[in-house]
Amino acid sequence: MPRSVNSVAKRARRKKVLKQAKGYFGRRKNVWTVAKNAVDKAMLYAYRDRKAKKRNFRSLWIMRINAAARQEGLSYSQFMGKLKTSDIGLNRKVLADLAMNSPEAFKAIVEKVK
């Protein structure tokens, strides 16, 4: 019995990977084995960095809140502690946005928690 191969599916699978490798430099864009490795590595980086993005933004928000709170005479930890005890339910993202785009509103929050 002759060997059965599914060339249609094989070609479709390879075309899919080569399409994902579009824009790569050199053999990474058109040689199947090299492109497959490059796309696999790119997918790993994308997965890892989707997780890291959340951490990076949180640290950016903390830096912005800290800078704005220090201008008002409080450290970040003091400000967040007083914010929690005064039952103000604003998260770090909103606080950082207030600190950047409307400093007078942030200053009002600081005065309220002092």
UniProtKB/Swiss-Prot annotation:
Pfam families: Ribosomal_L20 (PF00453)
GO molecular function, a single term: structural constituent of ribosome
One GO cellular component term: ribonucleoprotein complex
Keyword vocabulary terms for this entry: Ribonucleoprotein, Ribosomal protein, RNA-binding, rRNA-binding
Keyword Ribosomal protein part of the UniProt annotation: yes
GO BP annotations listed: ribosomal large subunit assembly; translation
Family: Belongs to the bacterial ribosomal protein bL20 family.
Biological function: Binds directly to 23S ribosomal RNA and is necessary for the in vitro assembly process of the 50S ribosomal subunit. It is not involved in the protein synthesizing functions of that subunit.
NCBIfam families: rplT_bact (TIGR01032)
Protein name, entry field: Large ribosomal subunit protein bL20
Species the sequence originates in: Christiangramia forsetii (strain DSM 17595 / CGMCC 1.15422 / KT0803)
Gene name as annotated: rplT
